[in-house]
């Protein structure tokens, strides 16, 4: 049973728009959320995904503000996170409202090449933006919590987002270290979480205005840092999953009061059909749960019209960056290995070397070398030894998708059944029905997307899945009559 703190109710009652009723708000907060997912178009089109899942009893109701987002219904009560297609990275379990901020940032004419996600974990919006960028340009994804950085990296890897650079800092440092470096910035700020009560019945049990005001001070510092990191002419989207004015309009107004006409609010009134139902006088989206039968959410978009002075002197460049650009000989060798042994043509990105490791970085990352420490950049391609190259799992997940549709071009692909895919993801070797000639390293594929690597020994596939990715449980969604 949802518990709404009376102080919260009293406060929200004063802020609820006149055309909405408090009874409807409380009723909406008491209803379970509709299940929603976003198709990962880095691996599969929405149409192909629907064709894949409809025989398994899924029905799809389009989310109006996300082309690849759907409310779904199906009969199974199992946890979707264990589904084979989820482990494979074909979809992300994401609440519908949380798909709004990337949609607001990536309007149809946006061509952002360098983007910052200031508070990224667990990665729903990061991977949504990676798909909108089609793994082009550079997406810097920051997360302050050390434990959540690991979750972020796992989701980036699972979804095949290859052009990300992960950082682990307090978001308040970006305006200093990466001043006016980004075409676009998303800040989905840490907040009081008033909008998620449908998912967490106790979210508002101990609500207090003092805590709200304290959080809003942190949010003001974060949005100012994000604004300083934004290039002139760039766009910033600020969002929260909370409902009070202090953490939403108040934070945006603070930024405009601080930087004057350098801050230009952009109306989101026409972002999607029906957006006007949630649009505030300033042009922000204030999504109350009863409007779209979703979580509560707030989204604001602004343009930085001119440069503003930096608050701190420019930091000195950091030394001892551990990567060097591959020589022409090294680059040719790794490209030949991927093409000849795996049937994968490496994209025209920056091939970097660290000791015996080969990595693929976005070209745009060059401008960031020495400015900040990064936890993880791009994709690790392979390790090199006297025996040759050994491909990395993450490279296959991020880069093999296009090769799998054209095995005749030389891609070494073994298609497996759903039962075999389950066995593979649980770390087991796969017996082959008929013995044949050993083929060495092959890409294991299910349903047109890669699962990972195996060694073809003629009579079986020897599993090469990294131990930390082995699953205890894999759910096969059964066909429905």
Swiss-Prot record:
Natural source organism: Shewanella sp. (strain MR-4)
Binding residues for S-adenosyl-L-methionine: 119-125, 143, 170, 188
Compartment(s) where it occurs, according to its Swiss-Prot or TrEMBL record: Cytoplasm
Keywords: Cytoplasm, Methyltransferase, RNA-binding, rRNA processing, S-adenosyl-L-methionine, Transferase
GO cellular component terms attached to this protein's record: cytoplasm
Family: Belongs to the class I-like SAM-binding methyltransferase superfamily. RsmB/NOP family.
Catalytic activity: cytidine(1407) in 16S rRNA + S-adenosyl-L-methionine = 5-methylcytidine(1407) in 16S rRNA + S-adenosyl-L-homocysteine + H(+)
Principal location: cytoplasm
GO terms (BP aspect): rRNA base methylation
Protein name per its UniProtKB record: Ribosomal RNA small subunit methyltransferase F
UniProt GO molecular function: RNA binding; rRNA (cytosine-C5-)-methyltransferase activity
Domain of life: Bacteria
Function: Specifically methylates the cytosine at position 1407 (m5C1407) of 16S rRNA.
Enzyme class (EC, first level): transferase
Enzyme Commission number(s) from the entry: 2.1.1.178
Catalytic residue positions: 241 (nucleophile)
